[in-house]
């Protein structure tokens, strides 16, 4: 069926499909002429500045951008969401690495795309971003789902400090 008829609240998507959604949105904006396209691009820049990395949305002096973001949401971004049925609260991205820029775009238009991480042989989901203040950071796979424990080990099984590459080892109850 047509996504506008179904009016979903949540969308599960692989990054490649989300990229196509973005291309279609941008093509639709482009068709409306250079003035609309410039306004849309400016609105994105303002929303990007306000949202920053998602985790620090509206912090510091950026709170002053909130009225402008709300205006652009009402006159532009709401129409983008209507193209998806108007009810989408968030996307869940999985199956491949989700580009932070793609997350930034969908967050700006009011359809946050949440990244998760999982292994079918371990458990379907190991970590995930979620909605809420300070719970969503672009380019991150979020917090570890409880009661799981994650460690990064070197090739000899020694635990590695944060930021050092190694093998991901997961333990659950």
Residue ranges and their predicted role:
Residues 8-88:
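Alpha-helical "lid/cap" subdomains adjacent to substrate-binding clefts that gate access
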Residues 11, 68-173:
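Conserved AMP-binding/adenylate-forming
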């Amino acid at each position: 069926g047509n996504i506008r008829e179904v009016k979903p609240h949540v969308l599960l998507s692989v990054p490649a499909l989300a990229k196509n959604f973005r291309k279609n949105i941008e093509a639709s904006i482009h068709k409306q002429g250079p003035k609309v396209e410039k306004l849309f691009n400016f609105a994105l820049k303002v929303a990007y500045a306000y949202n920053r990395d998602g985790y620090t949305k509206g912090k510091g002096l950026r709170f002053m951008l909130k009225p402008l973001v709300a205006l652009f949401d009402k006159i532009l971004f709401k129409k983008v969401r209507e193209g998806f049925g108007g009810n989408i609260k968030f996307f869940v991205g999985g199956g491949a690495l989700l580009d932070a820029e793609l997350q930034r775009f969908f967050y700006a238009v009011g359809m946050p795309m949440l990244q998760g991480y999982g292994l079918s042989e371990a458990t379907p989901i190991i970590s995930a971003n979620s909605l809420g203040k300070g719970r969503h950071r672009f380019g991150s796979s979020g917090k570890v789902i409880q009661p799981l424990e994650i460690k990064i080990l070197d090739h000899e099984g020694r635990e590695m400090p944060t930021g050092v590459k190694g093998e991901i080892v997961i333990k659950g109850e």
